[in-house]
Amino acid sequence: MYFRQAEPEEVYDVAINMRERDFKEIDALRWSEGREELAQGLCNDLGSFQNVFVCGDDEGPIVVVCYVPLRKGVWSLGLFATDRFQKVGSFLTKRIIRDIIPSLNRANAHRVECQSICGYEEIHKWLKFLGLKEENVVKGLGKNGEDFKTFSWVREEAGSHGWERGSIKKCA
């Protein structure tokens, strides 16, 4: 298994083959029409961005995870994956805990947020495992009126030491 900075082709490959639920979630938040246009848009937007990573195995890329600054101290966390996510899920979770969370601490993040379509409980449970808290429901946020939940980690709520591994459940 590998976890490294993503190449544009890898972003495209994961995006064009992403899980149906991921497609519905991300497509609801973008101007694109259809899977090809969405994949091309994600490739163009994320393909050369520094904080975009790919996780995969010998068969190819499986997951793209990114963290993007929205403004000083505020970051957005995102992820999309193929149907083979379970093959790298535990490995990826460990990489996020060991690599991405410390990077966000070093960047002095005081807020990390993520929006996820209502009803995607598998992902909501995982976000909570990572230490994000369910904050609110944003009604009608999607282009077809879909409701989304906002999950966040806020330094003030976590204490002055930041988003430390000690504040996150131990990963098996």
Task: Name each region found by the language model.
Residues 77, 140-172:
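C-terminal "cap" of GNAT-fold acetyltransferases
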Residues 1-18, 22:
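A short beta-loop-alpha structural element at the N-terminal edge
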Residues 54, 59-69, 75-78:
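Conserved beta-strand in the GNAT
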Residues 49-54, 64, 148-150:
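Short hydrophobic/aromatic beta-strand element in the GNAT-like acyltransferase core
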Residues 88-104, 129:
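Conserved acetyl-CoA-binding loop-helix of GNAT-fold acetyltransferases
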Residues 72-86, 92:
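Conserved acetyl-CoA binding element of GNAT-fold acetyltransferases
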Residues 28-49:
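Active-site rim helix/loop that mediates acceptor-substrate recognition in acyltransferases
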Residues 112-128, 140-143:
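Conserved beta-strand-loop-alpha-helix junction that forms the acyl-donor binding cleft
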